[in-house]
């Protein structure tokens, strides 16, 4: 039998790290497992200006502070550690981690967040990693003094486009509608930036190039006229999809693939809780994920106490 923990948290984004902070501070033996780096989607943000009590900083900085807090209180954190199997039913729940084996726990918190939504085009797949990216923080520096495209019209798309002007010589924002879905002040900030240009009501037709991206071809929704945009990089910011495929057939989901929970973050399986962007909800912010992680941790502590007391759970 592998090492036993009180609670295993799947995911080291803001929800998972917050849960880890609360659990470990309560002397609950906790393991956090993540297939990537700590921070989740949060690390993709250049500037975070709306996190209460914190001056404008990067998502990376916030994630590292959260990670240090969790570890300081005694939480074990395993990153770059894909989960290869799990059993979430019954009293003995376990998670199998690549190259590490099985870890057992009395309760599980699912906090695997979301993954960037793709356009679903063959040419998009061809240039992933050779010009096409979904993370400005990760890859922006590679495009210093180059012309790039940013696809999307929401808050993240415009905020990240502004951030990319620190590196790129020109950023062309391509959006499928005539109006942005971003908040007005974010749109105004983008419009005031001399490096940013706009192409509205456009369909993405194709990405072209040889061994790396060279052009983005778009077409007007109104006239069908095509425009070829020279670009060595293209950042796609069209939202996220819940990272819940590993829970399919195990936990109840809605038609969007989001986990269904109650207010206490209980899922359809006793002893399994969910927190963050993978669950069914309207608003997704760092702060809402932190709130979810807090509630999930406290609910999980209640669950462990009820088990110890022999109360129904």
Q: What would you call each of these model-derived segments?
A:
Residues 1-10, 26, 31, 44, ...:
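FAD-binding core/adjacent interface of flavoenzyme oxidoreductases
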Residues 5-75, 152, 158-183, 254:
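Beta1-alpha1 glycine-rich phosphate/pyrophosphate-binding loop at the start
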Residues 20-21, 44, 120-123, 161-163, ...:
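Short amphipathic alpha-helical segments
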Residues 37, 116, 155, 178, ...:
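Short, glycine/serine-rich, charged loops/turns that create anion-binding
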Residues 70-97, 102-105, 166-263, 302-313:
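A Rossmann-like FAD-binding core segment of flavoenzymes
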Residues 118-119, 158-159, 181, 226, ...:
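Glycine/Thr-rich phosphate-binding loops of Rossmann-like dinucleotide-binding domains
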Residues 120, 126-142, 238-288, 292-295, ...:
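FAD-site-proximal beta/loop scaffold in flavoenzymes
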